[in-house]
UniProtKB/Swiss-Prot annotation:
GO terms for cellular component: cytosol
Function: Pyrophosphatase that catalyzes the hydrolysis of nucleoside triphosphates to their monophosphate derivatives, with a high preference for the non-canonical purine nucleotides XTP (xanthosine triphosphate), dITP (deoxyinosine triphosphate) and ITP. Seems to function as a house-cleaning enzyme that removes non-canonical purine nucleotides from the nucleotide pool, thus preventing their incorporation into DNA/RNA and avoiding chromosomal lesions.
Record protein name field: dITP/XTP pyrophosphatase
Subunit comment: Homodimer.
Length: 206
């Protein structure tokens, strides 16, 4: 069966694909927003990651008739009162400019001592079906903000996020290492029972 992943980011699609494969869930064809007829995406106006994930998943079902998985995630920094939060992707003003977002965040934390650079990645994943079923789960990944970027893997703020108890940034981890501990990996793992049930029931889009 086909399941829509409400994203144009191939790394998010690959992440869900790895989680499904490692968990033995088969018979799923994941499609992204680039694989379906284009539709106008609703602005992410929710006050929380959960709100935004549901907004995206509901729109995906509405426009394609496919069961839809959507996530909204971001970085919550202790010293910034848990911002950027839902503004993480456009913290510098332009949506998806990872380099600018990272540079601005590092500048804002330049005078913050190491012991006060705590942060957490947060991911909310929503699954909405054509039958109207909805579920939202959350995953968190605690750590701290490095002073300089390091690593070539991942995306977003990965090069400056050091997981708690680790010495490498998230961008220095292999995809498999990251899947096992990351916020999105944890959220997707929590979503697996619902995805497995959906596949077993063999629900198909109109």
């Amino acid at each position: 069966m086909k399941i829509l992943v409400a994203s144009r980011n191939p790394k998010k699609l690959a992440e869900l694909s790895r989680v499904l494969e490692s968990s033995g869930v088969s018979g799923v064809e994941l499609v992204s927003l680039t694989d379906v007829p284009e539709y106008e995406e609703v602005p992410e106006t929710g006050a929380s990651f959960e709100d935004n994930a549901l907004i995206k998943a509901r729109e995906g079902v509405k426009h394609t008739g496919l069961a839809c998985v959507a996530d909204d995630s971001g970085l919550a920094v202790d010293a910034l009162n848990w911002m950027p939060g839902v503004l993480s992707a456009r913290w510098s003003g332009r949506h998806g400019d990872d380099a600018a977002n990272t540079a601005l965040l590092l500048a804002q934390l330049s005078d913050i001592p190491d012991e006060r650079r705590g942060a957490a990645f947060v991911s909310a994943c929503a699954l909405v079906t054509p039958e109207g079923e909805e579920v939202v789960v959350e995953g968190r990944w605690k750590g701290s903000i490095a002073r300089i970027p390091a690593g070539q893997n991942g995306f977003g703020y990965d090069p400056i996020f050091v997981p708690r108890g680790g010495l490498r940034t998230a961008a220095e981890l292999t995809p498999e290492e990251k899947d096992a501990v990351s916020h999105r990996g944890r959220a997707l793992a929590a979503l697996l029972p619902m995805l497995r049930n959906l596949v077993n029931l063999g629900r198909t889009a109109p």
